Amino acid sequence: MARATEIITGAESTNKLGYQCLQHELVDGFFNRINLLVASQAIKDRVARAEKTLDELRDPVKRAMKLWGIGSDAVSRMETECERVCRDPGERKLRRFCDMITSVFNLMRDRGGMRLEVFQVELMRGFFIGIAANQFRDDLFKYKHIILDLLGLATPDIVAFNPFCPSMDTGREINRIFDEYGKNYTLALAPRQCGKTTIMVILLAAMISYLDIEIVVQAQHKTMCETLYDRVELVLHEIQHSPWYPEENRIVTIKGTTETREFIYDPAYKGTTRVHFLSSSPNAARGQIPDFVLIDEAAFVNPASLLSLLPLLAVKNRKQIHISSHIAKSWVTRVETIMGSDGKRAFHVINQRFKCDGHAHLPGMMCPCSAVFCPTHIDLNESIQELINNITPGGCELELTGGDGAGVLKRDVATPFSEELVRQFMTNAVPDLSGVKRVFIAVDPTYANGTQSSFGVCTFAELNNGMFLVVALEEVAIGEMRSILMHFYTTVLMAHVDYILGIINRKDIPIIFLPEQNTFMFDNETLWSHLSGAAERKFGIKLLVYRQFNKSGTTEIGKLVSGNKASMVIKVHNMMEADMLGRVMTVASFGEIVKGLYLHNKHVISKYYRADTVKTITDARDAIANPRDIEDFKKLPPADSAEYIFRYLGGTEVSVAHGDDGIFKAGTELVTRLGCELMNVSLKSVGRTVKVITGGKRYQGGSYSRDDLFSAFLLGTSMMGRPDDATDGLFIVT
């Protein structure tokens, strides 16, 4: 007999009854519907006949008659064919899937009629519908209406739906519900002690009991993982020793440790289920290929751990569920704002609170709209609210009610550079430089020993209309350049001067060196001496330097920003909004290229002295003392000899080739980095002052975050709108 469905490839085809379908009949929706109905009935009739034949062959007398009549080979072939027709893997999977859903309801009934909260019902629906695609694959279309019926989501039309003779409207409604709950990522937010973990433990135990699947469960630390496993094991035992669970389908044995548990069943029932209970660490889940991922208290889990799991969402038919309490300013609060290409929410988000947004400003811990979501075992009263809020203002609304306490907890914090504003600045690109008034090379240097800082540079071109354009950027870790720091800084800054002279093609434009004042004033003077001398020798120009007046009336090189940083940030924000801050189309960067050239020279010198390793000085105090004479030099080991020669020669001469387009690729990357550093900036009110928080110098994921590029950018923009007769400082040659 022909297959239940067929692919129409020509103008004609034959239906299941042998009728030759003409072209006009193939495009007739009513004819196709009747044809599918007949085909569906034909399949059912075929299965019924096969089951009847198998029943006859199981009867000893009838089997003997068949053997006598057609022979043993024919009977064997008949039996095999009938078993093939009746054996539908999808039907067996459906039976187990339905048993899994039913077991959850049976367990709740056995527990005395356990009442689910609204968010628990939504979470359960997202769980079952989300893993259905992994279990049924291409056969899912046949069973969607059955699953929706079991979960209480089916209308009468959905209950009566025939997937082989579908109603278009009902089919669309089924797909709409599946698209809503069946997204590959579900985030469930609910206040403390509402039962997030409780419902997931039950669902995990049911999944382990019925499905062939690999699972990853992640929590903050090992103790939480062990607690989760103990709870799952208890519910698993409760399910498998219930009267409604078949005894022959119980777990045969459990192998492994908490990190990888293998639940082994009789192969005649189902395969092995593996569950990995992993603590939060960046690489704990790498190498795993789970079908289902659960993360408990996701808002508090190490971000690096999330980054090892979230990329798995790109794999089809995988499901992740993250559950968490609310936390102000966390990434979990922004997930529901992510939209798909269809304008709808990209992910399934469940956000249960006891107080809605419309009543958030009113006193009390609940509102008439959302009070129904408060579980009966939680008693909220004003005394508890006052106690918690005495410790942390807004803490009760956040921890117990699920309200957004961010406005209360962080009302003294402002984020001046929003994503939209930064994007506006980055897209404000000017194709060429015309009408340049002067150029500022703003530098955030570091001279300290053992610091994690980088060398930050931001070169601006100021136009006649007052607009500032970013021309070149640097943010280079200086650890490997410690021994030749001044030479390295001078080479990079000279590359900026060379680039500026090339693109404006004029030498009469003032180029001003603008370093940040710090405790190493002598080093700033030394750097200026190196730079001004090199520029005069190579280009025949005299650079200017900014000197700021101090309290005694004398001038010091550079600009002091520590006391004015907040006002400078606000000024930059206003200038960005007014489109007075932009960039050239091709921002350049030379630092990493120059650093690579110096490291190459260092390697060549070390190779000449046959040093096994290249000695890297990250702290000037670790550098070798200068040898007093040639005899002292000869006594040095190869690595120290190479390091001394490298330092003595100033790294030797290096220069960036004018045809190296790598400077623009590096510049584009730094423009993006500058945007990220800008978005990390916040203003916090501390007493009567406003503190600028840049987010730099923090250890994250094995490295320190940086803010040196932002510091140089902020320093340069401080010169915006500065009148020529300003009395804060001077632009002078020496």
From Swiss-Prot:
Give the gene name: ORF62/69/71
Q: What organism does the UniProt record list as the source? A: Ictalurid herpesvirus 1 (strain Auburn)
- Name-wise, this protein is Probable DNA-packaging protein
Query: What are the UniProt keywords, alphabetically?
Result: ATP-binding, Nucleotide-binding, Viral genome packaging, Viral release from host cell
Question: Where along this sequence does the record place binding of ATP?
Answer: A190, P191, R192, Q193, C194, G195, K196, T197
One GO MF term attached to the UniProt entry: ATP binding
